Design a protein with these regions (language model features):
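Short gly/ser-rich loop at a beta-strand->alpha-helix junction or flexible surface loop bordering the NTP-binding
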Residues: 1-71
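C-terminal regulatory/effector modules of DNA-binding transcriptional regulators
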Residues: 51, 55-119
Length: 119
């Protein structure tokens, strides 16, 4: 990718061309909804893995695109559109972030304070 945003739109196009239901989640969704820190890995929920991924290819580790196939369609409930990109609900973003390693807990707290307004 030329930059992170370029990667978002390229992945968006690949998934749409393959008729894959998806929504950006975790750090990527938070980057779009309530940016707090730089991101370098694109994360999304997909209802299935696409057969054709263009210039993307699977790797064992250290990839820059991570696709999750959730156990339930509930992960897509409340999906929102930001900059013409699908993003999971704010609550789902928060739940994703608090379960992820690294500084994602900081991002979750920032999202909670600025968007969710919980106690």
């Amino acid at each position: 990718f030329n930059n992170y945003d370029d990667g978002l739109f390229k992945l968006h196009n690949i998934l749409q061309e393959n008729h894959i239901k998806f929504a950006f989640m975790g750090p990527t969704g938070a980057y779009l909804r309530c940016p707090y820190m730089e991101q370098n890995i694109i994360t999304a929920y997909v209802n299935e893995l696409p057969y054709e991924m263009g210039k993307l290819f699977p790797v064992e580790k250290d990839g820059n695109v991570v696709l999750y196939v959730p156990q339930s369609e509930r992960f897509f409930l409340g999906q929102q559109e930001i900059r013409n990109l699908p993003v999971v609900s704010d609550i789902q973003l928060y739940l994703d972030l608090i379960k992820m390693p690294g500084r994602n807990e900081d991002q979750a707290e920032y999202l909670r304070e600025n968007i969710l307004h919980w106690g």
